[in-house]
UniProtKB/Swiss-Prot annotation:
Organism whose genome encodes this protein: Giardia intestinalis (strain ATCC 50803 / WB clone C6) (Giardia lamblia)
UniProt entry keywords in alphabetical sequence: Cell projection, Cilium, Cilium biogenesis/degradation, Coiled coil, Cytoplasm, Cytoskeleton, Flagellum
Top-level taxon: Eukaryota
Family, as annotated: Belongs to the TRAF3IP1 family.
Pfam families in UniProt: MIP-T3
Descriptive protein name: Intraflagellar transport protein 54
GO biological process: cilium assembly; intraciliary anterograde transport; intraciliary transport; intraciliary transport involved in cilium assembly; regulation of microtubule cytoskeleton organization
Length: 465
């Protein structure tokens, strides 16, 4: 199978062998022509046709890189001036031994320019006697020109199709790789943004919950004794926090639980309700009981004044002016009364003092001294709470605004991502259009080149005739 490079080498050999015989035109040398080989070809062509100019080729060898560049620039300029077509080749590529197809095209154009120069130099001489015969033979020349154009057009179309096929495959591969890379980057960026958004939402919810929910103080646990059970057995009582409650008295029944090794001694109850039992065996007892029942309803109560101050509201004063029991009560009632009197004596330290049920002015003074700072503290705390409520509302509003701004930012980022993808697609389409224009321009250059070649062939055939 003949490749494009092999075909170019053969066409180069065909174009140069009509002009020169040395240096040898071999496929090995033309597969990657060195600079010395190109210099020898230019010198041989110049000696045979006078093109390029002998002054520009008057070198045995050129070793300096700048001089080589100047020599190639001069040769390319002369070819362009002679043919009127620019030579599509890079001098650096020729010196480096790269881009061999363009180097071979330059050599072919060198041969064509030399042939054209030779024809023009011969046409400047007096025309030969057979000139009328040439004018008569013009129709066959037109046919040859048409055949040459057709052949060049077919060759050009074939090369153009091959080039377009290669470019199309390369563009498809690059486009596919770019789309996959963009898709992967977009997915990774969206996952990262979604994860970050979820974390921020969770943090905001936690902050809002912590700001809204008040800090509750742990309940205090106390114990109270039960009259119906033993002293050692206690039941836990949960004391709820409340405000505007007067401080407890010194002899309050409630006490905090302390870790002690021995159980505390039982304290006497502050108040006992004793129901009088009627005895039918004694008429005197029945009469006394009936008399007492008419006075106080059949019940005798021993009251603790401090307990009354703590438990009873201030609107219900306790009246302790009940008449003392007479000495003619029964034995059971007498024992109960003696027990109550002994309890009062043990509690107040003096038997002559009777419980009044109301706190004295002396007992209220320490309570007032403690209650006033507590009330001030409560009022200060209430004022601080009232002042902090607007700030809490503003903080909630700020949280809502921040959440809205984050949502808008997320929407804007999505819009920017879409715009970026659209711009990338437009850029790829512009690149494709640019490649198509370049391919068309290249095909036009090839057409011009084929037309020039056909013109040279026609001139050569004219000279042969």
């Amino acid at each position: 199978m003949i490749t494009i490079e092999t075909e170019l080498i053969n066409s180069t050999i065909d174009a140069l062998k009509e002009l020169i015989s040395r240096p040898p035109l071999t496929e090995k040398l033309l597969s990657r022509p060195p600079f010395k080989y190109i210099l020898d070809i230019c010198k041989a062509v110049s000696a045979a046709t006078g093109f390029p100019s002998p002054e520009s080729c008057n070198y045995d060898d050129i070793t300096d890189r700048e001089e080589r560049t100047a020599f190639l620039t001069s040769i390319i300029g002369q070819i362009t001036d002679q043919l009127g077509v620019p030579v599509d080749v890079q001098i650096k590529s020729i010196l480096a031994g790269k881009d061999v197809p363009k180097t071979l095209r330059m050599l072919v154009m060198l041969a064509q320019a030399a042939k054209l120069f030779k024809v023009r130099s011969n046409s400047s001489q007096p025309p030969p006697q057979q000139a009328p015969r040439e004018t008569v033979a013009s129709p066959p020349q037109e046919d040859l020109e048409a055949l040459a154009r057709e052949k060049a057009e077919k060759e050009r179309q074939r090369r153009e199709q091959e080039q377009q096929e290669r470019e199309r495959k390369e563009r498809e591969r690059q486009e596919k790789e770019r789309e996959e890379r963009e898709k992967h980057e977009l997915e990774s960026r969206e996952r990262a943004e979604a994860e970050q958004w979820k974390q921020k939402q969770q943090q905001q919810q936690q902050q809002q919950q912590s700001a809204i929910s008040p800090q509750k103080s742990p309940p205090k646990v106390r114990f109270a004794d039960d009259d119906k059970t033993r002293v050692e057995e206690h039941q836990p009582v949960i004391e709820r926090p409340h405000f505007n409650r007067p401080p407890p008295s010194q002899h309050s029944r409630r006490m905090a639980v302390t870790a002690t090794s021995e159980p505390s001694a039982p304290q006497p109850s502050a108040m006992r309700l004793v129901k009088v039992v009627r005895e039918e065996s004694s008429d005197e007892s029945n009469q006394d009981l009936n008399q007492n029942a008419g006075q106080d309803g059949g019940f005798t109560m021993g009251l603790d004044a401090e307990w009354c101050d703590e438990m009873l509201p201030g609107e219900f004063p306790l009246d302790t002016g009940a008449p003392a029991p007479s000495s003619t009560h029964g034995e059971l009632v007498a024992n109960i009364l003696d027990t109550a009197e002994a309890y009062n004596v043990a509690l107040h330290g003096d038997g002559s003092k009777k419980p009044t049920g109301l706190s004295t002015q002396r007992d209220k003074k320490p309570i007032d001294s403690y209650s006033q700072p507590v009330q001030k503290l409560i009022s200060h705390i209430s004022a601080i709470i009232r002042k902090s409520v607007p700030y809490a509302k503003h903080t909630a509003f700020l949280d809502e605004h921040i959440l809205t701004m984050r949502t808008e930012l997320h929407t804007a980022s999505e819009a920017v991502t879409k715009l970026l993808s659209t711009s990338l697609k437009q850029e790829s389409s512009l690149k494709q259009a640019n490649n198509a224009c370049e391919s068309k321009l290249h095909s036009l250059k090839e057409q011009i080149y084929s037309l020039r070649q056909a013109q040279l062939e026609l001139l050569h055939s004219t000279l042969a005739l």
